[in-house]
Every structure is written in C-alpha cells, then in structure tokens.
C-alpha cells in the first residue's frame, strides 16, 4: 500500500488547509505583480501560514475528540430513582404458608419485638392514625371504625399497596378485614393490638389473586408478610419508634476498641489520629488510624442489636450497621446488616491468645435500648469493637461501595497529615501560655456533614435492594 495512504486524517486536513492558503497567497502575489506594486515576500509571512495550517489540524482534532466524548455510551446507577422508563420487574406470587422474610415475625430482621398492647385509654393511643383512603374498603365488623386505626408506618405501606392493587387489577380494590383490635380476637402476641398488623384481601374475594396480593404487599414495604390462609393475607410492620430511631450505624459509647499499645479504650474517649485494631483487606488484623467520626452523640437514646457469641464476646450495634459474617461452607466473608444476623451464624472475633481473627458462633440475638452513639471511621473501613470485627459503615449492604464513597475523606485526611500541626504554627510567646485543648471528636455532636450528605442522596442513586429499610 502507498505510504501516503497511511497518513493520519489530521495530516490530510493540514495539507488541504495549506494548499488553500497557498492558492490564495499565489493569487494575491500575481495581482500585485500585474499592478506594478513591490512585493515584500518575507519568510515570517510564510511561517505564519504554516502555523495557521497546524492550528487548523489541532482544531479538527479537538472537535473530533469532543464529539466522541459527547456521544460515548453512558453508564448509570440503576434502578434507583431517576428519569426514564422503569425497568419491568417479574413478580412471582407467594405460595400458601410462605412468609417473607423467612424469619419469625418478632425477630429484628422482620417486624421486631412486641412493645405492648395499646388500649383506648393508653397514652400511646394518640399515636394511632385513621386511614380514610378511598381506594381501600374497610370491613369494620365492629362498627367502631377500629379497622381504620393503625400506626403511621402501617398506613404508609397500606396506601402503597392499595395503589399497586388498582394497577394490577383495574376495578379491584384492597380490602382490610382487620387492623387495630381491642376485642382480643387474636393470639396473645398479635401485633393487631398495637396497630402494626393488618389482615387483607381483595373486595372481589377472588382467592386466586391472593398469592400475588401477598407479593404486592412485600413490594409495598411491609416488614413481614404471611400467606397464612387461602382466605386472607397477614401483614405487619416495625414500630414507629424503631423506624425513627437511628437510621445510621453506630456503637454504644462504652464499647471498647484495642489501641496499638494493647490498651482497651472506650469509643467515647477515642480521638482522631488514634490507631485501633481493625481488619485489613487481606483479612488479617491491622492497626488503622481513626480519621473522623461518622456520628457522635453521647446523649441520644437508641435501639441496638446485641450479638452474643459462644466465646463470650458481646457486640452492641445499631440495626443498620454492617457486621462481618463468616460462611464456613464457602469459606467466604460477607457483610450483613446487624438486624439480619441470626443465631448459628459466625462472626470474626479477635483471639486474645494468638491475636488472630477467628470465627465464633452467634448463640443469641437480642435488642436493647441504650444511651449514646459513636461511629468512628478508620482508614481501613473496619474496626474491632468488643473483640468482634465490624464494618465502619451502615445502611448500604456493600462494604466496598461504602468504602469507595468515603475515599474523599481519606484523601482529605492524608492531605491534612502533610500540613504542619497547629502547635507548630504558634509563636514562642503564645506557646508559653497555658491552653486547654479540645479534640475535634469531643467538639462533634451529631452526624458528620459528609456522611449526612451521602445518606441523603442514597435513595436517589442506589436500588432499594441495596439499602437498609
């Protein structure tokens, strides 16, 4: 093949521009000679035209590059909220006696523990709200309107389900057979007495729809759904107090971390810059620097999950926090929300004799109410608290994604470490005066601004299945 055919398009464009300029320059030169004018044909003027042709090629290159970047295919996070048509999801009906999730109703991963019956004369009765949704048929066998009363969370999920029912079966409406109950027609541990449960069907009483109705209830956000009978579906939700409690991930202030010198230090006394025992990316113990506190509030009352292991370790943490769970069958380590850790699961615990991180079986999972929350963030993104390996992250069920999201804070911490300390910037006279230092950790009261920003945008960029609900 001819060597000229191997030239780049930009060179061809430059030659074209050069030939056009040469023709124009030659024509002007001939006209000047014919008119008798003296022509000053300087080398500088020739160089100017050559430079012009080079700029022409550069401009064409930049134009093509911009066009390529403009029309490159975009990769977006989905299927979270955003513009465009929603992806079609295949829904499968539940089968008779199936429950979602496959847990006991009163476990933390489902609707949670009982909080006590709410009679009409109870101070908590005012927390129940009536539901006047016209798209819902309330059976109201008692004639007192009791079936319209429920908790705020239950009403929210029920209204969402009513909308789904109308979309699934036009002309059919959701039927509420039972909601809050004051006549004790159910079992002793029924959530109907707290307004947290509903028994539902469809107003056309078509029993063939009830398997799909149960699936729609799951999609609507009910915390526990049971296809308990061919004649009705049972749904329940967490209490309003548990859902408005801490939605982030924290430990209790009295929980301890191991310092590099072997000392056990309460999390409430940790400071930025402390090096605490963590787990490295290779699964081995490593000491990592505390770079900030995602949250710190020593006065706030919160609900916690308490994990007890067969080795005596006890970890107290908020439900949305990520815990490392060892899978002995597959020999893999996964991160699971604390309220979804079950008995007989394995968590990694620091062995005081060997110093290694070894799996221990969870023998009991309980819930406690305690005061204060502390959430230190280490450079590794993990921390060993009360000898149990835990993540520094919460709410999102991906340790790697959460760690990537905090990369700017790690970079900022690294840059700050290169800057001179405040004490080095003081003058000699001011250094002789007594001063009282207050650490940034002690000054902080509440959620860190960057962590709060991430929590706010998560609903718009992450799928619901990735988030703690």
From Swiss-Prot:
Its main location: nucleus. The record marks 249-250 as: Cleavage. One of its GO terms (cellular component) is plasma membrane. The keyword Lipoprotein applies. GO terms for biological process: anatomical structure morphogenesis; cell fate specification; cell-cell signaling; intein-mediated protein splicing; protein autoprocessing; regulation of gene expression; segment polarity determination; self proteolysis. Ca(2+) 2 binds at residues 142, 178, 181, 183. Ca(2+) 1 binds at residues 141-142, 147, 178. It is found in: Nucleus; Cytoplasm. It comes from the Eukaryota. The record marks 295 as: Involved in cholesterol transfer. Belongs to the hedgehog family. This is Protein hedgehog. It comes from Drosophila willistoni (Fruit fly). The gene is hh.
